[in-house]
Amino acid sequence: MNLQNPKDRKLVHNRNIHCMGYIRKDGDFDIEAVLTDSKTYDFPSDTHGIVKKNTPYHHMRVRITVDVNLRVKEAHAMTISGPYQICPKGAENFKNLIGIKIGPGWKRRVQERIGGPSGCTHITELTGPLATTAYQTIGGEISRQRRRGIEANNLPEINQENNLKNSCIAYSEAVSYTHLTLPTKRIV
């Protein structure tokens, strides 16, 4: 299915964000995200000469390790490619995410700890997709393990309905979401 037919146009910019969720042997979860920006044409750069078309001029990679309660235990970031020589320094404060929990207030706490003039806009932007990927990874893994009859990492009983209430139109109190079958022993 496509969006409505667009006007005649030409692609000039690509931004790709790719997220991955892993369960570790120790029961924690690694959540990774990669961001790349590229142009569909060659262009001059003050620090890199001519940047060839489809070559990432922004290329950032981040990883957080979270426990089943979504608390950040490890945080790593790197700038593989940035437009300025100082750009890799913006990844250094990513470790300041250690100790905070993904949940209500996540974006505000992230901004306070790694945003602004000592951080990297693009690395900070990746923390939104990291959070939703963590929810999907952990919730999916808990559900998968329970379907297989495996004790899912000794997780506490969590009511999914309370976690999702009013988070989107499907879970809106204004629209009865009783049509959804909600597992009662999942995090997501």
Model-predicted regions and their roles:
Residues 14, 21-23, 35-177:
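Active-site- and interface-proximal helix/loop "cap" or "latch" segments in soluble metabolic
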Residues 178-184:
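Conserved small/polar residues in nucleotide/adenosyl-binding loops
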Residues 1-23, 32-33:
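N-terminal "first-domain core" detector
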